[in-house]
């Protein structure tokens, strides 16, 4: 079984913020695959299904970003999922908006949700779908920036990014992370928002 985790913060206040990018993609994946994420427990909203012949568990931790690992660890332990079968979908300040990068293992880039997951799972070997959100002009503004909503120009292209990220996840499930990396890691989806 694969555990696919979308990162974000619960509650209406954070619903449309950049930090909830992972939630957006997971919601799209669940809708397209007819997987109801209505189960509660393990500090998450979650649901089980089958994609490309493989059992999958989709989950959105409800712990707030900085404690995401608590939920991921509970799910992985209960369903006996090894760290290499965990795929985390998250926003990434180090990538421009419109860029998606797939990655297996590696550093956390200062992302507090990833740090929490790495600490909770005992290592960084989980897979990631990194969703670029760009950076604010001033480094000191990062905390505010990730909790702001997307701009109007970003919103125009957001659906395309979400659908592309969903397709990348499907390829990870069906063909493996390396094949999906070859397909998606050179892609840039920002032709409509050069002004951002």
Curated annotation (Swiss-Prot):
Family annotation (CDD domains): PTH
PROSITE patterns to which the protein is assigned, alphabetical: PEPT_TRNA_HYDROL_1
Stabilizes the basic form of H active site to accept a proton, annotated site positions: 91
Positions annotated as active site in the UniProt record: 19 (proton acceptor)
Superkingdom in the source lineage: Bacteria
Broad EC category: hydrolase
RNA-binding is among the record's keywords: yes
Residues that, per the record, bind tRNA: 14, 64, 66
Keyword DNA repair: no
Record's keyword terms, sorted: Cytoplasm, Hydrolase, RNA-binding, tRNA-binding
One Gene Ontology biological process: rescue of stalled ribosome
Reaction equations catalysed: an N-acyl-L-alpha-aminoacyl-tRNA + H2O = an N-acyl-L-amino acid + a tRNA + H(+)
InterPro entries for this protein: Pept_tRNA_hydro (IPR001328), Pept_tRNA_hydro_CS (IPR018171), Pept_tRNA_hydro_sf (IPR036416)
Cellular component GO terms, alphabetical: cytoplasm
EC number: 3.1.1.29
Family from the record: Belongs to the PTH family.
Assembly description: Monomer.
Protein name: Peptidyl-tRNA hydrolase
């Amino acid at each position: 079984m694969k555990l696919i985790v979308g990162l974000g913060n619960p509650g209406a206040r954070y619903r449309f913020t950049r930090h909830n990018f992972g939630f957006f993609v997971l919601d799209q994946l669940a809708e397209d695959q007819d997987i109801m994420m209505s189960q509660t427990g393990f500090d998450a909203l979650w649901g089980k299904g089958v994609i490309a012949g493989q059992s999958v568990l989709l989950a959105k931790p409800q712990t707030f970003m900085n404690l995401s690992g608590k939920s991921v660890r509970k799910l992985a332990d209960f369903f006996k999922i090894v760290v290499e079968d965990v795929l985390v979908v998250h926003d990434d300040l180090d990538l421009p908006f419109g860029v998606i990068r797939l990655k297996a293992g590696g550093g956390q880039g200062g992302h507090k949700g990833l740090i929490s997951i790495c600490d909770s799972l005992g290592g960084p070997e989980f897979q990631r779908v990194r969703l670029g959100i760009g950076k604010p002009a001033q480094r000191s503004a990062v905390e505010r920036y990730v909790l702001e909503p997307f701009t109007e120009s970003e919103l125009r292209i957001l659906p395309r990014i979400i659908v592309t990220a969903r397709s990348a996840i499907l390829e990870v499930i069906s063909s493996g992370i390396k094949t999906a990396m070859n397909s998606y890691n050179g892609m840039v989806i920002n032709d409509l928002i050069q002004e951002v």
